[in-house]
């Protein structure tokens, strides 16, 4: 089974990807995590990627697709792709790779959210340094300064989680990622869900659709 989760920044792709992976026993794949792993392991690909990133350049699609191919080799029951493909060219390049696998593309789920909600979520997003948990103050009543997952007080806000950055990322989403939605929109395995609901409700809607497409 191969599941793709799309959506604007702050829509909850990461959260829902983890939940889907846990429920269906799938491998959670984030291209950002794959890149960071290659860089941390000082692989040849990691060295090339680091040089590009340090120079303020984007990592080319070919390099990302190479990472994805390697990740697919150890996919087990299947994968959840977290926020990938991000561009139309990535979607087009990924298509023949998926066609060559035994599993089919089971579901492409687009988490919809208004621009105001996206901005608020990005600004209120926090991460735990201890366990890596990402959470949102918007959904926590009477936040006590502790990570909801591990209880650590070592909480921080990522440097790019601010209003100006949110606007820039929304613009990039409209110009680069919305065409990906058009690529999949008329497929029977495409589904839009309302991301303004709480994560449990969103997950329930996603799960119902996946169950129908398994």
UniProtKB/Swiss-Prot annotation:
What residues bind AMP, as annotated?
A: 31, 36, 57-59, 83-86, 90, 158, 169
Q: What PROSITE patterns does this protein map onto?
A: ADENYLATE_KINASE
Q: Where is this region: NMP?
A: 30-59
Q: What is the lineage of its organism?
A: Bacteria, Pseudomonadati, Elusimicrobiota, Elusimicrobia, Elusimicrobiales
- Taking the first listed entry, what is the main subcellular location of this protein, grouped into a coarse class? cytoplasm
Assembly and partners are described as: Monomer.
Instruction: Report the domain of life of the source organism.
Output: Bacteria
Q: Name one GO cellular component term.
A: cytoplasm
Q: Where does Zn(2+) bind?
A: 128, 131, 147, 150
| Protein name, per record | Adenylate kinase
State which gene encodes it. Answer: adk
For this protein, what reaction is catalysed?
Answer: AMP + ATP = 2 ADP
